[in-house]
């Protein structure tokens, strides 16, 4: 019954479009909802993540950069506090409605490489998900997103 009531309350206040977060930090609220809690973002991350552990990590606050627009993509970059070089992730979403790709790097588990995932499947490797201020999403990832996977 509580879930039903929650759906009705949510139906009265639609979540903001993902593009409303561009220029804001992922934890900043737009219409009372952070990017991490935006239902569309959560669904797209769930569809891209290869497992529950990575999905949970990506949907958790960390050290953030402002959400950017890269061409037709919304790009959010986050890392683990005090371990940004060792544990970082990026979410790239083809606006307005997806699909999404996730870059994930855990230096303790991945031998220095980062992996890009779409639809739960690894589609490529890179040196890292982000270095310093900005790293563009690789062209191969953008092409896969544009094709719908």
Tell me the role of every PLM-derived stretch:
Residues 15-30, 35, 39, 108-149:
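C-terminal partner/receptor-binding element of secreted or periplasmic proteins
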Residues 73-74, 98-100:
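Hydrophobic residues embedded in beta-strands of well-ordered beta-sheets
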Residues 92-95, 105:
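Solvent-exposed alpha-helical segments and adjacent loops
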Residues 83-90:
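Short, surface-exposed coil-to-beta transition loops
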Residues 101-108:
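Catalytic Cys-His active-site segments of thiol-dependent hydrolases/isopeptidases
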Residues 1-7:
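Bacterial N-terminal signal peptides
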Residues 75-81, 104:
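Short beta-strand segments that buttress and anchor functional surface loops
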Residues 12-74:
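N-terminal secretory signal peptides
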């Amino acid at each position: 019954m509580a879930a039903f009531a929650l759906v009705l309350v949510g139906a009265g206040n639609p979540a903001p479009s993902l593009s409303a977060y561009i220029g804001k930090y992922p934890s900043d609220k737009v219409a009372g909802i952070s990017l991490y809690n935006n239902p569309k973002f959560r669904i797209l991350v769930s569809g891209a993540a290869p497992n529950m552990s990575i999905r949970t990590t990506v949907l958790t606050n960390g050290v953030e950069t402002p959400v950017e627009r890269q061409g037709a993509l919304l790009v959010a970059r986050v890392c683990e506090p005090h371990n940004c070089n060792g544990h970082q992730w990026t979410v790239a979403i083809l606006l307005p409605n997806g699909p999404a790709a996730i870059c994930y790097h855990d230096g303790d588990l991945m031998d220095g490489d980062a992996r890009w995932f779409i639809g739960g499947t690894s589609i490529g490797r890179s040196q890292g998900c982000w270095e310093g201020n900005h790293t563009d999403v690789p062209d191969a990832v953008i092409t896969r997103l544009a094709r719908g996977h």
